Amino acid sequence: MNQNQLPKRSDEPIFWGLFGAGGMWSAIVSPAIIILLGILIPMGIAPEAFTYDRIMAFSQGFIGRIFLLLMIILPVWCALHRIHHTLHDFKVHVPASNWVFYGAAAIISVIAIIGVFTL
């Protein structure tokens, strides 16, 4: 290798970071939200805490919007990164696969940002 030649920088750490964050979010936070929305609220546990007005007020506040974005964006990046590498492991070669999968995740993220901030 020539002394003047710099090694090629990889963009993979960025995607692995989003993959890891999405995996942790999906494993820790999502089950709690599923229990809350799928079991506790329908059973009527603490109905005064989970009224429509309070949930809408939370989701329209800054912290609520960030929470909604994290609930949407991080699992999407995790899933598309996992699909990308699973196809690679199975020797299914998608042309320009980085652009396809990470581009799709970026587009979905932008759509989520627009959707959450127009809520």
Swiss-Prot record:
Keywords: Cell inner membrane, Cell membrane, Membrane, Transmembrane, Transmembrane helix
Membrane topology type: Multi-pass membrane protein
One GO cellular component, as annotated: fumarate reductase complex
Location(s), subcellular: Cell inner membrane
An example Gene Ontology molecular-function term: succinate dehydrogenase activity
One annotated GO biological process: fumarate metabolic process
Primary location: membrane
Transmembrane segments: 27-47, 61-81, 99-119
Summary of subunit composition and partner proteins: Part of an enzyme complex containing four subunits: a flavoprotein (FrdA), an iron-sulfur protein (FrdB), and two hydrophobic anchor proteins (FrdC and FrdD).
Function of the protein: Two distinct, membrane-bound, FAD-containing enzymes are responsible for the catalysis of fumarate and succinate interconversion; fumarate reductase is used in anaerobic growth, and succinate dehydrogenase is used in aerobic growth. Anchors the catalytic components of the fumarate reductase complex to the cell inner membrane, binds quinones.
Family listed: Belongs to the FrdD family.
This protein's name: Fumarate reductase subunit D
Source organism per UniProt: Proteus mirabilis (strain HI4320)
Classification lineage: Bacteria, Pseudomonadati, Pseudomonadota, Gammaproteobacteria, Enterobacterales
